[in-house]
Amino acid sequence: MTIDTSNEVKAIARYIRMSPLKVRRVLDQIRGRSYREALIILEFMPYRACDPILKVLRSAVANAEHNEGLDPATLVVSQAFADGGPTLKRFRPRAQGRAYQIRKPTCHITVAVAPSNKD
């Protein structure tokens, strides 16, 4: 099975309030899988990162179907990655006038799908 990357279609979710490290753990499981397999994996994994990834995957497939006229049954996850976004910085008051910084990470999730050529 080869992947035709000339017809690659992608979707991006930006500023997701989640650590990119935790999102990558899930993305590694669906990269290279068919759309059908990826859906099943994401539905049953117990991680919080699965919901936004599932949303981005469905958006990428909808883009492929609507914009390129591709059949969802032939689509494979060709690329899946999470880049770090801006970090929200907050402060927690501590004793004697001190304050500790709290970092709330965000990430940008990109999922690309492409049709597979079955040899």
From Swiss-Prot:
It comes from the Bacteria. This protein binds specifically to 23S rRNA; its binding is stimulated by other ribosomal proteins, e.g. L4, L17, and L20. It is important during the early stages of 50S assembly. It makes multiple contacts with different domains of the 23S rRNA in the assembled 50S subunit and ribosome. The globular domain of the protein is located near the polypeptide exit tunnel on the outside of the subunit, while an extended beta-hairpin is found that lines the wall of the exit tunnel in the center of the 70S ribosome. Coiled coil: none annotated. Part of the 50S ribosomal subunit. GO terms for molecular function: rRNA binding; structural constituent of ribosome. GO terms for biological process: translation. The gene is rplV. Disulfide bonds: none annotated. Belongs to the universal ribosomal protein uL22 family. InterPro entries: Ribosomal_uL22, Ribosomal_uL22_bac/chlpt-type, Ribosomal_uL22_bac/org-type, Ribosomal_uL22_CS, Ribosomal_uL22_sf. Keywords: Ribonucleoprotein, Ribosomal protein, RNA-binding, rRNA-binding. It comes from Microcystis aeruginosa (strain NIES-843 / IAM M-2473). This is Large ribosomal subunit protein uL22. Pfam families: Ribosomal_L22. GO terms for cellular component: cytosolic large ribosomal subunit. PANTHER family: CHLOROPLAST 50S RIBOSOMAL PROTEIN L22-RELATED, LARGE RIBOSOMAL SUBUNIT PROTEIN UL22M.
